[in-house]
Amino acid sequence: SNLDDIPSPYLEGVLDEFFDVEYLIPITETMRGCPFKCTFCATGSFNTSHKLHHQYHKEIRYLLEDLEFSNLVFRDPTFFLKASVVMDCAELINDIGNKKWKGQARGTFHRQYTPEQFKFMRKSGLTSVMFGVESGSQRMLDLMIKKVKREDYIKSAEVLRDLGVEMYASFMFAMPNENVDDLKESLDLMRQLKKINPNILLQNCIFLPLPATVENPA
């Protein structure tokens, strides 16, 4: 269904009484679903649906201007995949001024934007980019159908380091078919990313066979 047909809980004001501008960071989205079909993830089993330009503009302005939040998180599973939307949001946040924002990207982040676009995102307030790395083993990445190369994460880490933007990298262990060599490659990639940027945030997760995924189709 069209996301614009669903009333925004922000714009309807139903969440206002729960907001604490000093301690909370609001989450918004420009789309739902994911065009990729990673074997462990249920998000890819849903069709993608995008909000129209004017809808997410209203929400961003409401949160950052009307409620005066200083931070914003874009929770789209692959927010940075659509450069036109990302740059549109960056321009809006830059116009509002003195705000910070973050979002989730794929490993291919480093080759999806020009150097000028990267710099503008940083100027507009981009402070952190989150990656679901999952594994440092190319064999495992291929089995997961991640459609990304191990080296992509290294190059993205270098781009973020040069921009002065935080990198948040999540790894997943105990996947089906994972062996000791795969595990060692994941640990090695963690060390490489840490060497590139000592301030990187690393998260370790244990595989959970979610329903409606390739790993658990029930």
Describe the residue ranges of each PLM region.
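Structural beta-sheet core signal
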Residues: 103, 169-171, 204
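Glycine-rich beta-alpha loop elements in corrinoid/cobalamin-binding modules
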Residues: 1-3, 212
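Flexible glycine/acidic-rich beta-alpha junction loops that bind and position SAM and/or redox cofactors
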Residues: 36, 83-84, 139, 143-144, ...
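Radical SAM [4Fe-4S] cluster-binding motif and immediate context
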Residues: 9-167
